[in-house]
Structure formats: structure tokens, C-alpha cells
């Protein structure tokens, strides 16, 4: 007879790494084309003018300019306002 009971494996004790989601550039910040503005799951924030939407719903800048967040009809929208060239 065994004097020690078989040790049951612990079924907890692990955690996945955070996904680093969220707003990466805030209102009024300067961006260049390709800069990521928001990383998100689903379209919590919708793309506006001069921004693109990636297949994973990442919003990124298409032009050089300043980031602008606004709310229209209960939708958060992000735009990039271009800088007037001199």
C-alpha cells in the first residue's frame, strides 16, 4: 500500500499577459502617417477623417496632424486634423 496519496495537480495558478490595448495618442497629440492612435477589441471608438481601421480594429493615422476625439450621436470618433503646410 502506498503511504502517500497521489498529488492532485493544481488547476489554477496561471494568468495570460495583458494585451496592451487602449488609447496610444491623446487629444491634441501630433501624429505621422502609420502612428497607432487606439488599440481595441471591436469598434468602441469609430474611425473618422484621415484615420484608418485595421483588421483587428486598430485605429491609425493616415496623414500628419493632430489627434481629435469627439462624440457624435453616442459614438466616440477619432479624427486627425492636418497641419497647414507653409
Curated annotation (Swiss-Prot):
GO MF annotations in UniProt: structural constituent of ribosome
Positions with biased composition (Gly residues): 1-11
GO cellular component: ribonucleoprotein complex; ribosome
Span list, region Disordered: 1-24
Family, similarity comment: Belongs to the bacterial ribosomal protein bL27 family.
Keyword entries, A-Z: Ribonucleoprotein, Ribosomal protein
PROSITE patterns: RIBOSOMAL_L27
A GO BP annotation: translation
Record field: transmembrane: none
NCBIfam families in the cross-refs: L27
Keyword Glycoprotein listed: no
Highest taxon of source: Bacteria
Protein name, entry field: Large ribosomal subunit protein bL27
